[in-house]
Amino acid sequence: MSANAALRCSNFDERRDKAMALFAAKGFGQVSMRELAAHVGLTAGSLYHHFPSKQDLLYDLIEELYEELQATLDQGRKALARGKPALPAVIAAHWQLHAERGLQFRLADRDLCCLSDQQQARLALVRLRYQAGLLKLVAPQTRLSGPALVATGQALGTLLNQLPGWLQGRGLAEDEGLRLMQSLLLGVIERTLKDAVI
């Protein structure tokens, strides 16, 4: 990669991160294109050369997070391959991801409704795949089916995605927060999915 190409990539990532921080701070709907352009150091007209639309940028940020969530399941698969339980590895991966991408979690939680119906539908499919993969990983023998299985996957995914935000920054040491998250989730899973592989 040439020095110019590397600089362009670096500038793009910087601008994208600045846009994400602005959306997270003010809310997607409260940010105008003019304000967004000024915040990332561009003119309003040149902003469209970098991002097709404000909505497309939000979609990319949330889609990237969902792809990273899917990748957290790989940590559980690796743990199983080493003969270890999957859930602690998955929980630790979610904890770390939340520490690294807290702003994206905020956007996905709060501003998903600002996307088009088509964008929301695509992300809903990605989220369902993630939730199904999560259940298959931690409870492959579950007897739940149909709506109960889907609802359980949604609840478990939501807990994994929300607990780090609730626990981080509460004055707990990191290892203490992670242990508390593991304890909470293990309790939920043991009571709901008695045959879960934890």
Where are the predicted features?
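Short coil/turn segments at alpha/beta junctions that flank glycine-rich nucleotide-binding fingerprints
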Residues: 25-29, 80, 101
